[in-house]
A protein has these predicted regions:
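Acidic, proline/glycine-enriched N-terminal capping motif
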Residues: 1-126
Length: 126
């Protein structure tokens, strides 16, 4: 079974906490500014890592076991899962976040001195 492991430095952010509603031809809900800043910071790093390692975007079912080391005890697991999945798609690690079919082994933890996400993407037969 193939597993890809990596660490994303910096405080992970959820996508929907403090979401913004805009009126642009109708109502739209935008992701939180904190998530956008985090995504814009880590996506280029992840893209460069994928290029260095000649990784093609994942286009088959995987389990994402992610340890979210947060700077504070806030946010819910589902919000962190969604935020990470969208970052992995934006960076080209996964072709589409639909390929993340499970989050077995994921946990929310706190490490204010060194926030990060440690993750392992493992191929699955689901």
């Amino acid at each position: 079974m193939i597993t890809i492991t990596l660490t994303i430095p910096g405080a992970p952010r959820t996508k929907k906490n403090s979401g913004r509603i805009v009126h642009a031809g109708g109502l739209r809900l935008l992701p939180s500014k904190a998530w956008e800043q985090w995504a814009n910071q880590v996506s280029p790093m992840l893209r460069a890592w994928a290029l260095r390692n000649r990784l093609q975007p994942i286009a088959s079912p995987v389990n994402c076991a992610a340890l979210f080391y947060r700077d504070a005890d806030r946010g819910d697991a589902v919000g962190f899962y969604q935020g990470l999945a969208d970052v992995l798609e934006k960076a080209g690690i996964v072709e589409n976040d639909k390929w993340i079919v499970s989050w077995d082994g994921s946990r929310l933890r706190k490490d204010a001195s060194r926030p990060r996400v440690e993750l392992a993407l493992t191929a699955t037969k689901e």
